[in-house]
Amino acid sequence: MGTARFLRAVLLLSVLLMVTFPALLSAEHHDGRVDICRLPSDSGDCLRFFEMWYFDGTTCTKFVYGGYGGNDNRFPTKKACMKRCAKA
């Protein structure tokens, strides 16, 4: 029974890495810098409730930020998000 649980955990971790890793790679510039506008929304680790904006690849969308952690694709206003991420 313990082996089955371990294998299930390894499989779950493998799937999670296969989904997350390409998204992070696609967010990198050729010089190694990360384009924050290509990062996925990340609500962070805490349980606070802040309405923030992130760029979803097309436009800026509201999401709830927990107040700690997350990534830099997080803006206090739609205007700030569009200014940083919208391509003219």
Curated annotation (Swiss-Prot):
InterPro entries: Kunitz_BPTI, Kunitz_BPTI_sf, Serpin_venom_toxin
Prosequence residues removed at maturation: 28-33
Disulfide partners: 37-85, 60-81
Every BPTI/Kunitz inhibitor domain range: 37-85
SUPFAM superfamilies: BPTI-like
Record key words, sorted: Disulfide bond, Protease inhibitor, Secreted, Serine protease inhibitor, Signal
Tissue expression summary: Expressed by the venom gland.
Site positions for May bind Kv1: 39
Protein name, as recorded: Kunitz-type U15-theraphotoxin-Hhn1e
